[in-house]
Amino acid sequence: KQAISSTAVDSLDKFIETVAKIYHESNRKVEGIALSCPGVIDAANGTIKVVVAYPYLQGICLTELISKACDNIKVSLENDAKCAGLAEAWIGSAQAYDDAIIVVLGTGIGGAIIKNKQIHHGAHLFAGEISTLIVDYDKETNQVLTWSDIASTTALCKRAAEALAVTSIDGRRVFELANNADEVVLEVLKNFCLDIAIQLYNLQYSYDPGVICIGGGISK
C-alpha cells in the first residue's frame, strides 16, 4: 500500500507512467488493475466522460492505455464514490440490502445508487451524481446553488471559517471545537447536518432504498 501525491501527476503520460511503475515494481502476481477515479465514468468502455480534477484524462480510453503499458493486463475503471458503493454492498453496511444509496462527503459529494446489489449508472451515466442536486436558484443572477456547495466537507470548513471570522479552518479543527462545545461551531454543524438531512429525505422519497450509507473523510 502506497500513496502518490496527485499534484505530482499533471499529464496523461505521467499518469500512465505512474500506474505502470507501480505495476512493474510489484513483487506479487497481479491479475488485474482496478482504477477508482472522480468524475462521470463510462465503466463499460473504460472512459472518463467528465472530470474536473484531472482534465487531461477526459474522453480518454484509460483502461486501454494502462493495459498496454502493463503487459496487456485486465484493467477496470469506475467512479470513486461508486467504488465505495460496491464495497458497502459487498462487505459493508449495505450488504444486507438489495437497494441502497451511498453518500460520500469529501471535497464534493459523491454518490452511488445500488440496485439489486449492482451499481446503477442510468441512461446517461448520471445516476448517483448527487453533488449537483440543486438546493437553491437565484433568478436575478441566474446562479445555481448545489448540494455540494453547502454540504461537502469543503463547504463545512468554509461555513465554520466565516462564522468564526477566520481566514480558513480544516475539518479536524472544526470537530475539535465542536467536541469542546464551541457554541459558534455547534450552530454551524447543526445547520450543516440539517442541510444533509433534507437532501437525504429527498433521496429516500425518490428511490426508497433499504438503507442510506454515509461515508467519506468526514466519517473519521
Model regions: which residues?
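Gly/Thr-rich phosphate-binding beta-strand-loop-beta motif of the actin/hexokinase/Hsp70
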Residues: K1, I102-I119
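ATP-binding/phosphotransfer module of carbohydrate and carboxylate kinases, centering on a glycine-rich
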Residues: K1-G32, D42-T47, T63-V75, A87-D99, ...
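Residue-level structural signal for beta-strand termini and adjacent loop
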Residues: A3-S5, Y54, L125
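A cytosolic small-molecule/anion-sensing beta-strand core signal
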Residues: E31, C37, K115-N116
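A charged helix-plus-loop insertion that forms the helical arch/lid used to bind
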Residues: T47-G59
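Short loop/edge segments at beta-strand edges and connector loops
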Residues: L77-A81
